[in-house]
Amino acid sequence: IFISLTPYQYTYLNKLNGDFATSYNRFENDYLATSIKELIRKIPNNTNIITNNKKIKISFCGAPHNLSRRELDKLKNFDYEVMDLYEGNYDYVIMTNRALADRDENTLKNVKSCFDKIKGEDIIKVERNGLMLSTLRKKL
């Protein structure tokens, strides 16, 4: 099982944690966000958002902005604008399952992962053994 996670071995959880594919509800699995590079590299081959000849409004949740921007800038003919996640005026979100609290509340009662908080359609995913590590999600 360890080899099948390559290069994300640090996401390994043993069988005592239950079903590996649903552990995103209990842990921040890709806490280093290394799957973001793989996710962004899939955009030209797995979507048609580059061929629409329009600027894409994109936001990030749990994904480091500098890493995400650097990888997005490598895509040919990909015109994008980074939008504020909390304002909600984006078309797509690049995300991991990092915990996300409400901006205005300093409590733990409303903390959810990015996967749970941001609704939409997963366009591209990076998965290992059924566990989603990161996704490009289209806003509903």
What are these regions (language model features)?
Residues 136-140:
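Short beta-strand-to-coil "C-cap" segments at the C-terminal boundary of structured domains/repeats
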Residues 1-135:
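Catalytic lumenal/periplasmic loop and adjoining terminal transmembrane helix
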